């Protein structure tokens, strides 16, 4: 099992709303996962801008993580994970919902962070139309829901998150006291990995 080393990323020079640089993603997924809390996911769509604050994530640590898609055979599906960090790994679950992961670390180290929930910030009307849901709390409170609300699809597999269509911005600072930690969800098949506490979330976010 990995030992979690908290490595604080130096972001004092980044202002709120500034796009995250490539270096942010070139760290292990556990570090990136914690630092993603409070950051803003942005999608520039033809219908307008969609924004949501990241409030829940899970880290998947590659070859030594039985819950990771990249644990076993390298395949076309997981190929993007073997590149440098800062690209999107999108996959379909249950034949109907997409999930968005952020590739982390350096080349040939296939680690990702799954986005599990957002707090909607901008483009609420478009999100409500896409989800056919009115309550703001229900728009992005799950990995499939957030992809639907944010209009993230299979076509976005491999998109560069340092580009201009889908990217992440600096948000309000998050302290260690605000972060909750738990086991990941729905990975009972993953042997000892099911007990790894690699899910991180903002404690006071509904």
Where is each model-derived feature located?
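Conserved, well-structured core segments that form or line functional sites
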Residues: 12-206
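Basic polycationic patches enriched in arginine
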Residues: 7-10
């Amino acid at each position: 099992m990995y030992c979690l080393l908290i490595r604080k990323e130096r972001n004092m020079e980044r202002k709120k709303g500034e796009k995250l640089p490539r270096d942010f993603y070139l760290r292990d997924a556990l570090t990136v996962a914690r630092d993603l809390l409070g950051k803003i996911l942005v999608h520039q769509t033809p219908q307008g801008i969609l924004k949501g604050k990241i409030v829940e994530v899970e880290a998947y640590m590659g070859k030594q993580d039985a819950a990771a898609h990249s644990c076993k055979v390298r395949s076309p599906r997981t190929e993007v994970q073997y590149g440098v960090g800062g690209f999107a790994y999108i996959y379909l679950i249950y034949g109907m919902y997409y999930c968005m992961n952020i590739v982390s670390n350096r080349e040939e180290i296939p680690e990702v962070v799954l986005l599990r929930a957002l707090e909607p910030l901008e483009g609420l009307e478009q999100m409500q139309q896409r989800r056919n849901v009115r309550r703001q709390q229900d728009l992005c409170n799950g990995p499939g829901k957030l992809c639907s609300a944010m209009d993230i699809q299979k076509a976005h597999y491999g998109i560069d998150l340092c580009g201009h269509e889908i990217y992440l911005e600096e948000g309000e600072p998050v302290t260690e006291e605000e972060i909750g930690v738990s086991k990941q969800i729905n990975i009972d098949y993953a042997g000892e990995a099911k007990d790894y506490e690699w899910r991180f979330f903002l404690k006071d976010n509904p």
